[in-house]
């Protein structure tokens, strides 16, 4: 049987998820509340400072050799592992929370001092700035010349304000996920430019008495401004102490050699939580990012009213997108990053990847994700749930990808790295909420039908499941022809894409305007 999306199957799952979040509780986060294992039906308004640290030379590590081979990936994973361990040690010392470590980006949160203390926001921002400089100083010392691991080049973004905390996992792996302006703006500041340094939004600048900037992304804090924050924060740790403890920890808990094996498709059977450096996966596969476009503004608009609808919308859409990836197309979700899903897919055998088929199926997967997204919006609105003006931006690419977990035993984080991972995210970021984009490597490996669908721009609009399957099948794509043949054999009521009106649930134009 080929992989397929089915309207009735999707509708049934969406309706069940809507029923699961009928009752929602919104709480204000206060002293001593736990953010661990937040129930699906609960969300917290959290007033805090969000910091994103972007390791800017990850891409250089992945391109250190002409061919993206195993040694390139081993060296890159060791690079990330060493720096992750150092940053985690810093956050523990300064009483900040690690939210996520996604490839080159580390997201952390400062909630202390609480708002019951005078000048709490100012003190939180000062503490975040002092910590940011500590991270920069430590990561300048945590390379390894013997292993050809360079020091990390870091750019840091900081914002302050209210965010919405919900759960970010399944089963026993629930961690808080933070939605809204502060996390989003901090992330954009960290990744918005090639210049290193510490960058604050105007909200964060005002909190510590600095003048607003017309271009915050180009206004790095000066040494004097950083020193003022360090003096005010009075962190009880120095970079020399962190580096010394980090080196001792590496001796006691060495990273070990990375060993790769292939994951026999389907990738949904990959147990990421069992992976270690000695048991890592690596093969040619498709990396895909699907981002709910407009969600940050939607959260900001509803942070104080109809917040329960935000929680319902997120959980329903996110759950359905994951179902499409894992159940309909037998792929593997790596993680949720805010309102974005990161996934992997692969077709082939235990020994080889069928690259052309993998790209064809990824194209139809992208279409299925949009069909489920549109259907979820439709069903949510039918229940009177306010969903704002949301879209879905999708990007994917093909290439060698290594999947493992970083960190010491008992404190590991998932990681999927490869040039295609970076490129697929770039392609997604270049899309509006109605667009799907394909990377150059995937395009080159694709069938002629897929290339015709995306065109020279390698981007297309309003691509849903029916359109993707019909267009590819009509143009001779073998995977799509098989899927259509099986669908027609199972039902005489299949609606051809050219016979139905596409009604996207985003008012965005292709160029991103409204």
Curated annotation (Swiss-Prot):
Superkingdom: Bacteria
Catalytic activity: UTP = 3',5'-cyclic UMP + diphosphate
InterPro entries in UniProt: A/G_cyclase (IPR001054), Nucleotide_cyclase (IPR029787)
Enzyme type, top EC level: lyase
Binding-site residues for Mn(2+), renumbered to this chain: 291
Main subcellular location of this protein, as a coarse class: cytoplasm
PROSITE patterns: GUANYLATE_CYCLASE_2
GO cellular component terms attached to this protein's record: cytoplasm
Domain Guanylate cyclase: 49-190, 286-428
Note accompanying the cofactor annotation: When crystallized with (non-physiological) ATP it binds both Ca(2+) and Mn(2+). The enzyme assay showing cUMP synthase activity has Mn(2+) and Mg(2+).
Region Disordered: start-end pairs: 495-514
GO biological process, one term: defense response to virus
GO molecular function: adenylate cyclase activity; metal ion binding; nucleotide binding
Keywords: Antiviral defense, Calcium, Cytoplasm, Lyase, Manganese, Metal-binding, Nucleotide-binding, Repeat
Residues given in the record as Ca(2+) binding sites: 291-292, 339
EC number: 4.6.1.26
Sequence positions that bind a ribonucleoside 5'-triphosphate: 52, 105, 178, 184-188, 291-296
Regions of compositional bias (Basic and acidic residues) in chain numbering: 496-514
Cofactor: a divalent metal cation
Compartmental location: Cytoplasm
Oligomer and partners: Monomer.
Domain remarks: The 2 guanylate cyclase domains fold into a pseudo-dimeric structure; the second domain binds metal while the first provides most of the nucleotide-binding residues.
Similarity comment text for this entry: Belongs to the adenylyl cyclase class-4/guanylyl cyclase family. Pyrimidine cyclase subfamily.
Its job: Pycsar (pyrimidine cyclase system for antiphage resistance) provides immunity against bacteriophage. The pyrimidine cyclase (PycC) synthesizes cyclic nucleotides in response to infection; these serve as specific second messenger signals. The signals activate the adjacent effector, leading to bacterial cell death and abortive phage infection. A clade A Pycsar system. The pyrimidine cyclase gene of a two-gene Pycsar system, generates cyclic UMP (cUMP) from UTP, has little to no activity on ATP, CTP or GTP. Expression of this and adjacent effector PaPycTIR (AC P0DV41) probably confers resistance to bacteriophage. The genes are probably only expressed in response to bacteriophage infection. Does not have adenylyl or guanylyl cyclase activity.
Protein name: Uridylate cyclase
Organism: Pseudomonas aeruginosa
The encoding gene: pycC
